[in-house]
């Protein structure tokens, strides 16, 4: 019998597969046995009610999807009063994703949603820091550390920092999040991108730029997971372009302890369950007794320096 359990800080998950924030909603529970997942991750919650970005919000390509949703949110009251009671009926640990405009607001929101039934908080720090220069918190090491530290002071729950790939050296941000007290890192959010309709000459998205997700992003995010795994001691959750067990295994070999599935679930609601079954089959075929033994188990050169890699 293969042991699929993985440890993410203080949380023990029955398996390493969970949804990416924003890709999982209550409607999926009617078509998917969510009790088979390792964890549940909510859509991102903000301190205020938000409608989201103007349309068009989505542009699809054969190997990726470009999004500009804008984090629509019904606010913390709706989350605490409605969503948490709903998710309590399921077995997997519940991870609440939050986003805020200031360091202080991150701490305040973390405290507000730290209610029974919530097992961890994921900090979406790819939003702009309105009190500083308007750049994303996750692009600034100092701001990243401040946000995580504020959240750790405000809640007894584990805090996961979701990093952005839109930086030069992601290990700098990974170390900053770890210094702030992050219990785990989610690597990574969507990649900033854009597209233009050549017939209308207009941008494909209402806000011009958006976040690129899907298989096309996996090699880039995989590299970032590998780098972060050699830069920090906290667990890493890989996120980007996972649609098969093979993708998840690659992330684990690169250094991830768990994996989030996002875009692929829109194409097939059962993707996460297929990935879990595939992980079990792989372990049985390759005589891997514990799936956690795959983490950071890539064979070959380790700790490749960025400057050496750039000479290809």
Functional labels for PLM-detected ranges:
Residues 34, 39, 101-237, 243-256, ...:
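Alpha/beta enzyme core
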């Amino acid at each position: 019998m293969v042991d699929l359990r993985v440890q993410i800080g203080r949380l023990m998950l029955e398996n390493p597969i969970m949804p990416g924030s924003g890709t999982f909603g209550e409607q999926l529970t009617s078509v998917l046995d969510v009790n088979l997942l390792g964890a549940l991750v909510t859509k991102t919650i903000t301190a205020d009610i938000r409608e989201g970005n103007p349309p068009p919000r989505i542009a699809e390509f054969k190997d990726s999807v470009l999004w500009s949703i804008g984090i629509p949110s019904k606010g913390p009251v709706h989350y605490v009063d409605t969503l948490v009671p709903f998710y309590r009926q399921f077995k997997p640990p519940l991870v609440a994703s939050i986003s805020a405009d200031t360091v202080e607001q991150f701490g305040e929101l973390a405290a507000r949603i730290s209610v029974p039934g919530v097992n961890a908080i994921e900090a979406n720090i790819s939003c702009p820091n309105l009190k500083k220069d308007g750049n994303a918190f996750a692009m600034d090491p100092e701001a990243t550390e401040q946000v995580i530290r504020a959240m750790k002071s405000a809640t007894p729950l584990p805090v996961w920092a979701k990093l952005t790939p839109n930086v030069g050296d992601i290990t700098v941000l990974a170390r900053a999040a770890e210094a702030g007290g992050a219990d785990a890192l989610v690597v990574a959010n969507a990649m900033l991108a854009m597209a233009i309709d050549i017939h209308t000459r207009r941008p494909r998205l209402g806000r011009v730029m958006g976040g690129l997700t899907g298989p096309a992003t996996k090699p880039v995010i995989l590299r970032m997971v590998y780098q972060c795994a050699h830069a920090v001691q906290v667990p890493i959750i890989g996120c980007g372009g996972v649609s098969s067990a093979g993708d998840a295994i690659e992330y684990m070999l690169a250094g991830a302890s768990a994996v989030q599935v996002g875009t692929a679930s829109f194409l097939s609601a059962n993707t996460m369950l297929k990935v879990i079954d595939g992980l079990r089959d792989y372990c049985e075929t390759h005589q891997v007794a514990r799936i956690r033994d795959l983490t950071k188990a890539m064979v070959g050169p380790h700790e490749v320096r960025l400057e050496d890699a750039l000479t290809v």
